[in-house]
Amino acid sequence: MAENERMYISYNNIHKLCQGVAKHILARNERPDIIIAITGGGMIPARIIRSFLKTKGQKNIPIQAIGLSLYEDLGLDNSVETIGKEVIRTQWLDFGALNQHFDSLIGKKVLIVDEVDDTRTTLHYAVSELEKEIAEQQKVLNRMSEETVISIFVLHNKDKPKRAGLPDSMMNSGRYIAAQTVPDKWLCYPWDAEDIEEHTMLAKAQGHD
């Protein structure tokens, strides 16, 4: 893959993007009750944005992780991957533990975090499956009147046709938040770098620091 087809993103840039989005969320009075990170790319942004969402007098926002796999390694070299057609659930929420320690997700503000919205397939799956399981919990616990509000935060939204959609209620109410919309290039994140100094230098050269 040619270098002009890659975008290098630095930790510094990610830190600033999370800070800006956190200010936006707090200004809208939409501080989440729980953050759900999609592994592995959503883990670091989730942890960073939680720091910026801290509010005096309130507890830290708990972070839960779900594992969803869409990319497939072609085995050609260390960087070539292809986008899979099917979402594979490798890790999911323990609703029993959530109900015991967190009073479930019912009636909560939930923020799903991932690094990139590429084809939107993974995000669609995450939202759809969470909505189904929350609806089931509402029936079991007889809490049908309580609304759970799901939002999404991604660092980057690729400007390209999507293979899947998200609820209109989310898209039309500002609950889908992309810190930046970028061209359809291969995004190189710092947590994938073998040489972080070289990676940061390349990110600076592209203005992504």
UniProtKB/Swiss-Prot annotation:
Its EC number is 2.4.2.-. Pfam families: Pribosyltran. One of its GO terms (molecular function) is xanthine phosphoribosyltransferase activity. It is an enzyme of class 2 (transferase). It is found in: Cytoplasm. Its main location: cytoplasm. Keywords: Cytoplasm, Glycosyltransferase, Phosphoprotein, Purine biosynthesis, Transferase. It comes from the Eukaryota. GO terms for cellular component: cytoplasm. Coiled coil: none annotated. The modification Phosphoserine is found at S79. InterPro entries: PRibTrfase_dom, PRTase-like. Present with 721 molecules/cell in log phase SD medium. May act as a xanthine phosphoribosyltransferase involved in the synthesis of purine nucleotides. Such activity is however unclear in vivo. This is Xanthine phosphoribosyltransferase 1. It comes from Saccharomyces cerevisiae (strain ATCC 204508 / S288c) (Baker's yeast). The lineage of its organism: Eukaryota, Fungi, Dikarya, Ascomycota, Saccharomycotina. The gene is XPT1.
